[in-house]
């Protein structure tokens, strides 16, 4: 009987795939199903986090107030005053760029073996008060200066003539822009292209502002350390812990 039943079962299942296990495992009378659930986003409940966080406090918004234009208050309110301040800024920027180069370049040459007298910028001019006077570039046959009054008068005459020429617009008064007069003041023709000139104006102003800050730093270094900018830089690189602005500031505190 059992043998015949197994034979019938085998014949009836011939050619069919046998299902050895149910698709869903059964434990007792219940079913266990495996589901893949996505993690739920849990809100922190804090107003300082998330995409909807508070970015500005109080009545402020993401837009800057109309009166914040990046300029000092009141200095650009009057167009004439602004034009005058811009002219002064550009002129001081140019002098600062020349001065910064004059402070660094002689010291750089001296550190590389070039001998031309005193290389530190604030010590070079004081040589005129010495007994032998001041030799330009360390060469007595070039310019041998012994009178500070003569140097002052010469500088006033030369600089005054150039500045007067610039402000007056040249000998014929044809120059309309005293800051960028062009002509003889632009021998390379950099102002021929208006777009290039506009870009150069911005670069000149940015580099000039940096040079003015650099000159201020050179002044402070000379007063505090009594050394030139490159010597101060070398000392800082050799011992950053003991040669920095904070270390010198603490030495100047009362009671030190």
Curated annotation (Swiss-Prot):
The chain crosses the membrane at residues 90-110, 142-162, 210-230. One of its GO terms (biological process) is photosynthesis, light harvesting in photosystem I. It comes from the Eukaryota. Chlorophyll b 3 binds at residues 147, 163. GO terms for molecular function: chlorophyll binding; metal ion binding. Chlorophyll b 4 binds at residues 155, 166. Chlorophyll b 1 binds at residue 56. The keyword Protein transport does not apply. Chlorophyll a 6 binds at residues 236, 245. Chlorophyll a 1 binds at residues 76, 89, 209. Photoregulated by reversible phosphorylation of its threonine residues. The modification Phosphothreonine is found at residue 37. Chlorophyll b 5 binds at residue 155. It is a multi-pass membrane protein. Keywords: Acetylation, Chlorophyll, Chloroplast, Chromophore, Magnesium, Membrane, Metal-binding, Phosphoprotein, Photosynthesis, Photosystem I, Photosystem II, Plastid, Thylakoid, Transit peptide, Transmembrane, Transmembrane helix. Chlorophyll a 5 binds at residues 203, 221. One of its GO terms (cellular component) is photosystem II. InterPro entries: Chloro_AB-bd_pln, Chloroa_b-bind. Pfam families: Chloroa_b-bind (PF00504). It is found in: Plastid, Chloroplast thylakoid membrane. Belongs to the light-harvesting chlorophyll a/b-binding (LHC) protein family. The N-terminus of the protein extends into the stroma where it is involved with adhesion of granal membranes and post-translational modifications; both are believed to mediate the distribution of excitation energy between photosystems I and II. This is Chlorophyll a-b binding protein 2, chloroplastic. It comes from Glycine max. The gene is CAB2.
